[in-house]
């Protein structure tokens, strides 16, 4: 099971996911393991490249509801983070710096999406944040994490103008690979 799970975590290609499903589907004797494997396959297929990114609702700092679908027509770069996450705090200024290089582009939005359970800690944390990144708090962090197959943060996601997943697990902004991946699709 662990080999199958690791194989799924290492690919976002729909064809490879289908191969993994075929390779492992009859190898589990325990019904709970089989069910867990099937759920992992379903999650991997939902997050495969080219799939429509699952819509979610979030709240901005004014308490207004925003949906992912409201950004159709723009590239969306998402930083999934929380106030209690040390690595998230480390990556945040680097994410902000990259967002700043694209600030003149009307067809790109950078979103810092908090998955904090308590919105009040998020409100305190974002009060001094730069305006180049839209600060949002996801309405249901558990549902969002399941939808996007997120088991750890920070996580960086790139969504295309038509709402399709381009990369559901971008490299960290502290690496050159982050900007290289963005430059394949975006123009500053």
Q: Predicted regions: what is each one?
A:
Residues 161-188:
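Thiol-/selenol-based redox modules, centered on thioredoxin-like
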Residues 78, 111-113, 157:
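Conserved hydrophobic packing residues within short motifs/helices of P-loop NTPase cores
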Residues 72-73, 80-97:
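Conserved redox-active cysteine motifs that mediate thiol-disulfide chemistry
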Residues 1-66:
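Oxidative protein folding and maturation machinery
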Residues 90-129, 140-146, 180:
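Structural microenvironment flanking redox-active thiols in thiol-disulfide oxidoreductases
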Residues 75-76, 154:
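Alpha/beta-hydrolase fold active-site loops
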Residues 72-74, 105, 131, 150:
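Active-site acidic short loop of glycosyltransferases
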Residues 59, 123-162:
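Short, internal strand/loop/helix patches
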């Amino acid at each position: 099971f662990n080999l199958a799970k690791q194989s799924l975590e290492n690919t976002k290609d729909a064809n490879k996911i289908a191969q993994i499903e075929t390779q492992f589907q009859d190898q589990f004797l325990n019904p709970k393991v089989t069910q867990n494997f099937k759920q992992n396959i379903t999650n991997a297929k939902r997050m495969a490249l080219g799939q429509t990114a699952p819509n979610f609702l979030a709240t901005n700092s004014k308490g207004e509801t925003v949906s992912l679908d409201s950004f159709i027509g723009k590239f969306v770069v998402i930083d999934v983070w929380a106030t209690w996450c040390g690595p998230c705090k480390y990556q945040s200024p680097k994410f902000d710096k990259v967002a700043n290089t694209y600030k003149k582009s009307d067809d790109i939005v950078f979103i810092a999406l908090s998955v904090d359970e308590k919105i009040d800690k998020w409100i305190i944390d974002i009060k001094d944040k730069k305006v180049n990144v839209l600060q949002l708090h996801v309405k249901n962090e558990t549902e969002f994490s399941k939808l996007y197959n997120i088991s750890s943060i920070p996580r960086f996601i790139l969504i295309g103008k038509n709402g399709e997943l381009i990369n559901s697990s971008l490299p960290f902004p502290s690496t050159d690979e982050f900007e290289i991946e963005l430059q394949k699709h975006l123009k500053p």
